[in-house]
């Protein structure tokens, strides 16, 4: 049993956070004595020390100066990791930098430049393992982020190892996007077969668990991007011009501010704020099927009497900071607190802040946008996801659900579960660690893992299928060199040419049958190429060459969105 480490960087829209995880890796190839368990993933290196670090702003802010992303952004994070992780295992410790919605908003060229400079900087200055830049340092789509978050949440709640235990749904609101992920019941698998993403995670006894998930994302619907769209809506609705003062119902009364020469004055009206933020949901946009939720996306109907959801990130910060209502959600109480806050004078809230009457994590910037964020969270939950406003379930059960002990609401906001922070990066490391051990076993010597964690048997001659064009090029290049060499050596002298012909005949009798047989013919190679599709930069096709190294899963942690197309950078 050896200790493995992994470095995972969540490169979000407002900042980048490095997290260190570790787990035990069994070097014994036997699976017979393994229990039916997932690997035990721990935060940090197991000594109880600091395991995460965050820097601001996000890496997308380096779009105009990408060459500085290493020294001015990543250095502090990776220096922290290099100091925390034992130096003798640096070369076998993988680094994954996964950029999310902030980078998705940039153009492809800007993304590629930032990621390319980031990867080169890490490779040049650190000994950590990055076998493939395009798979280790990349922009992940919203579906991947949602799937990882679902895995992390249910892993911490211990709902994954036993199939007779109900899993919980996952909601995540970041700065730029919103994600939802939940397991589909058997009754809905047929109707939504084209929308299912089946995730596979490996157990230590060699089995794999399979979960059919509905996962989707809304780019531009995170709290910060929604606020930007809200300001644009205010300006458009009141024909804002330089010198005009516009009313902002989502800001506290008495607060004034200026954006690009346009003055805004808070009025603190929650009902009007809810009305305006409701328009941001784009409920009028048509869907391809019913029910139509928001922004043209249909979500399978959820039976909230039998399905519980947890919300992280902004769902937690908005309900917990100032309001102190994180945890089991109760709509009437939360609405009342938000209404009271939005109607408070701005100077009164500043006085409470300076007198340290609020939570330590609260600052002036949070107070400025809290009324808007609370209104937006209310609309997304109830008008977007159709979470019931009453804690009584649809079948009039009084206690609701009991998946999470002591919680009796269809929605719960969380930051930690059993003192471990709920982060989608934990789901990413779980998928990596659980299937890494399986792929190292002799039983899976001819298998590879697809982006969803499924182990697939490699077809015959898979090495030819993976590199047909490259193989043809190499053979052609060798032939040309041999031809040029023969011209120089033998020239046009008849005797030399005769000796050369005899040499070729002897070579063909001794060696060539193994090289020029039907199994190695150029026709076979060309036939294999007919099975290949031209791959877009954002997709991965074909099985890998089997290896038992720790790199095998690092090359397979790619995940392609069905709705968001996030091109992968063409690194050299």
UniProtKB/Swiss-Prot annotation:
Intracellular or extracellular location(s): Golgi apparatus; Membrane
Entry-linked InterPro entries: GDA1_CD39_NTPase
CDD domains reported in the protein's UniProt record: ASKHA_NBD_YND1-like
GO biological process per UniProt: CTP metabolic process; protein glycosylation; UDP catabolic process
Cofactor note: Divalent metal cations. Ca(2+), Mg(2+) or Mn(2+).
Cofactor: Ca(2+); Mg(2+); Mn(2+)
Transmembrane segments: 471-491
Lumenal-side positions: 1-470
Catalysed reactions listed for this entry: a ribonucleoside 5'-triphosphate + 2 H2O = a ribonucleoside 5'-phosphate + 2 phosphate + 2 H(+)
Function: Catalyzes the hydrolysis of phosphoanhydride bonds of nucleoside tri- and di-phosphates. Required for Golgi glycosylation and cell wall integrity. Involved in N-mannosylation of proteins in Golgi.
Protein's name in the database: Golgi apyrase
Organism field: Schizosaccharomyces pombe (strain 972 / ATCC 24843) (Fission yeast)
């Amino acid at each position: 049993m050896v200790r493995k480490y992994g470095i995972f960087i969540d490169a979000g829209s407002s900042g980048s956070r490095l997290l260190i995880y570790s787990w035990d890796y069994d070097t014994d190839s036997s699976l017979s004595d393994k229990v039916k368990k997932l690997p035990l993933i721990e935060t940090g290196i197991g000594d109880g020390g600091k395991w995460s670090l965050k820097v601001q702003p996000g890496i997308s802010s380096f779009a105009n100066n990408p060459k500085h992303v290493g020294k001015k952004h990543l250095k502090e994070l990776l220096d922290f990791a290099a100091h925390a992780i034992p130096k003798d295992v640096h070369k076998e410790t993988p680094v994954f930098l996964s950029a999310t919605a902030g980078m998705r908003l940039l153009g492809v060229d800007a993304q590629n430049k930032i990621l390319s400079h980031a990867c080169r900087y890490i490779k040049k200055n650190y000994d950590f393992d990055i076998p493939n830049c395009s798979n280790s340092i990349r922009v992940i789509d919203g579906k991947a982020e949602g799937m990882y978050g679902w895995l992390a949440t249910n892993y911490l709640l211990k709902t994954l190892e036993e199939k007779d235990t109900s899993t919980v749904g996952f909601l995540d609101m970041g700065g730029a996007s919103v994600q939802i992920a939940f397991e589909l019941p058997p009754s809905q698998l047929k109707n939504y077969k084209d929308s299912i993403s089946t995730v596979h995670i490996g157990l230590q006894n060699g089995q794999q668990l399979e979960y059919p998930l509905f996962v989707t994302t809304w780019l531009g619907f995170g709290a910060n991007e929604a606020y930007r769209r809200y300001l644009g809506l205010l300006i458009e609705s009141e024909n804002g011009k330089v010198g005009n003062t516009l009313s902002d119902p989502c800001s506290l009364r008495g607060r004034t501010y200026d954006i690009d020469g346009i003055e805004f004055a808070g009025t603190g009206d929650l009902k009007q704020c809810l009305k305006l933020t409701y328009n941001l949901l784009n409920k009028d946009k048509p869907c391809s099927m019913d029910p139509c939720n928001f922004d043209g996306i249909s979500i399978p109907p959820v039976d909230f009497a039998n399905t519980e959801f947890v919300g992280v990130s902004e769902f937690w910060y908005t309900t917990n900071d100032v309001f102190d209502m994180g945890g089991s959600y109760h709509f009437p109480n939360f609405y009342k607190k938000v209404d009271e806050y939005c109607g408070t004078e701005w100077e009164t809230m500043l006085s409470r802040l300076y007198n340290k009457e609020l939570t330590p994590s609260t600052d002036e910037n949070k107070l400025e946008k809290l009324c808007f964020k609370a209104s937006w969270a209310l609309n997304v939950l109830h008008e977007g996801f159709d979470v019931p406003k009453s804690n009584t379930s649809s079948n009039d059960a009084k206690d609701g659900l009991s998946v999470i002990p002591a919680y009796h609401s269809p929605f719960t906001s969380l930051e930690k579960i059993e003192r471990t922070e709920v982060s989608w990066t934990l789901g990413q490391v779980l998928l990596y660690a659980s299937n890494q051990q399986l792929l190292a076993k002799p039983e899976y010597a001819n298998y590879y893992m697809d982006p969803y964690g499924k182990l697939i048997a490699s077809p015959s001659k898979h090495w030819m299928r993976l590199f047909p064009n490259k193989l043809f090029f190499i053979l052609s290049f060798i032939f040309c060199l041999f031809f040029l060499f023969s011209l120089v050596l033998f020239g046009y002298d008849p005797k030399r040419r005769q000796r050369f012909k005899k040499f070729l005949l002897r070579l063909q009798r001794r060696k060539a049958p193994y090289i020029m047989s039907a199994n190695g013919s150029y026709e076979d190679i060309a036939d294999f190429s007919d099975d290949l599709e031209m791959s877009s930069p954002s997709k991965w096709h074909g099985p890998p060459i089997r290896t038992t190294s720790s790199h095998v899963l690092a090359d397979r942690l790619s995940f392609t969105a069905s709705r968001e197309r996030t091109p992968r950078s063409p690194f050299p």
